[in-house]
Curated annotation (Swiss-Prot):
Lineage: Bacteria, Pseudomonadati, Pseudomonadota, Alphaproteobacteria, Hyphomicrobiales
Protein name (Swiss-Prot/TrEMBL): Putative phosphoribosylaminoimidazole-succinocarboxamide synthase B
Family listed: Belongs to the SAICAR synthetase family.
Any one biological process term the GO annotation gives: 'de novo' IMP biosynthetic process
SUPFAM superfamilies: SAICAR synthase-like
Catalysed reactions, as listed in the record: 5-amino-1-(5-phospho-D-ribosyl)imidazole-4-carboxylate + L-aspartate + ATP = (2S)-2-[5-amino-1-(5-phospho-beta-D-ribosyl)imidazole-4-carboxamido]succinate + ADP + phosphate + 2 H(+)
Pathway: Purine metabolism; IMP biosynthesis via de novo pathway; 5-amino-1-(5-phospho-D-ribosyl)imidazole-4-carboxamide from 5-amino-1-(5-phospho-D-ribosyl)imidazole-4-carboxylate: step 1/2
GO molecular function list: ATP binding; phosphoribosylaminoimidazolesuccinocarboxamide synthase activity
Family annotation (InterPro entries): SAICAR_synt/ADE2_N, SAICAR_synth, SAICAR_synthetase_CS
Enzyme Commission code(s) on record: 6.3.2.6
Pfam families in UniProt: SAICAR_synt
Amino acid sequence: MTTMLSSDLPLPKIGRGKVRDIYAVDDDRLLLLTTDRISAFDVVMGETIPMKGAVLTQISAFWFGELEGVVPHHMISADTDEIIAAVPALKPHRAEILGRAMLSRRTTVFPIECVIRGYLSGSAWKEYATSGTLAGEKLKAGLVESEKLEPAIFSPATKAETGHDENITIARMREVVGDETAYTLESMTRAIYTLGEELAREQGIIIADTKFEFGRDKDGRIILIDEVMTPDSSRFWAVDAYKPGQPQASFDKQPLRDYLDVERRAGRWNGDAPPPPLPASVVEATSKRYLEAYRRVTGKELKI
């Protein structure tokens, strides 16, 4: 399977995100094509990560299947043959879309990242260690790095296609989407995370934190969209290696984050685009983490 930095399919391309290319199928459907692009600290790298697009698409498809009947979602199919049957123009491009395409329902997307944190890690730990707060809200004193947060903390952010997302308060979120919608988004976020965290733990994975996106479909329903509990949207830890009070090894893009942190501390990168080039060792280590995440979450090896 070749890597993909960008795509060119015989459908109108209506969007390009940090990782996904979005194509219009018709008035009701979209094709989401997950490339092997990778971003960290909201900056897209110049290199691709082998198998990454397929991992993200197929983990999301797994979770959408598990969530069937729990929350409504946008996925129609992530099976390549089913997609080609529904969109025959894609038949000559089977090799390009294999494993990485998802046929989805169109929605009007809410401009909010619904972040939920079950453990104190990453940027949340850095904020707490500095000011004793998370998303601007005071937390109890004495928490340690990677400590479990009970209950999990909902901390929304604005959604940026490029550049840096910005954490916002729940009060600000209510101003953006309205009180009723804000309540629904938080409730759905908590329900999805609770179910996902329980199922992942059975597979030996802790989902330390994750983020979701939602949209409103043509019938007015709020539905789950985009990706679900993947290595790009989540922090995965091994249950059997979890030790609060220290950083945890992650089954996600942590090798990339660690490398970029070194480059920033050394003054070789200022945190904005363009990013530094990635060594082959970082690319390989990151690809292995993605494939391991798929195996851990689904209990299967990825076969495309």
